[in-house]
């Protein structure tokens, strides 16, 4: 089953009939418009390309304008592609709503995490700090050794060090679907999802459900 493009509205909480508080993230999923359908004969694989939201006319490039016009849909703020499984069929110009998640229990949500700039190893990788006293006056949050000696004579790739934290693609898996509000195009999932309020998200049925 394909996924949909949505927008993070923010977090709130809802209550069950028993009075239990559930923290939820509200995701607005406006109708996704199909801009292109790819098939085995022409493209070598089956997929559907969708757009969502709106984009100012002066922000749409000529190639984009032609692409949207050919599909007969309004220009959107993003283009995303989802692989199709056997039996799934879509047509160009078709509108797909949040209702496709009505029978889905768990979803995977992908977004771009909040950027936090250049961070040290304690914040970025949860390294332990060194002694606050006992003769230590300069190396409280220092990373410590980053290698061995003449053998191997290098720092191994992937070594956890200070650097850019956040602002990367992150997927949170198997979040419970709490509510699907088709009237207001809202999807409520339990827990937090990556990204800032207003950022784009990709919501798919969970692969580990």
From Swiss-Prot:
SUPFAM superfamilies: Translation proteins. One of its GO terms (cellular component) is cytosolic large ribosomal subunit. The keyword Ribonucleoprotein applies. Methylated by PrmB. The keyword Lyase does not apply. Part of the 50S ribosomal subunit. Forms a cluster with proteins L14 and L19. This is Large ribosomal subunit protein uL3. It comes from Pectobacterium atrosepticum (strain SCRI 1043 / ATCC BAA-672) (Erwinia carotovora subsp. atroseptica). The gene is rplC.
